[in-house]
Curated annotation (Swiss-Prot):
Membrane-spanning intervals of the chain: 17-37
GO biological process, one term: photosynthesis
Gene for this chain: psbL
Function: One of the components of the core complex of photosystem II (PSII). PSII is a light-driven water:plastoquinone oxidoreductase that uses light energy to abstract electrons from H(2)O, generating O(2) and a proton gradient subsequently used for ATP formation. It consists of a core antenna complex that captures photons, and an electron transfer chain that converts photonic excitation into a charge separation. This subunit is found at the monomer-monomer interface and is required for correct PSII assembly and/or dimerization.
Record's protein name: Photosystem II reaction center protein L
Membrane topology: Single-pass membrane protein
Taxonomic lineage from the root: Eukaryota, Viridiplantae, Streptophyta, Embryophyta, Tracheophyta
Amino acid sequence: MTQTNPNEQSVELNRTSLYWGLLLIFVLAVLFSNYFFN
């Protein structure tokens, strides 16, 4: 049971990519709001 499960690694990778995607969407939303409200 000391061997790491490759499924856990893929889940961790998906979670990291999901956080990066949300961060990218947030930054784009801020940039677009600044562009439209100026």
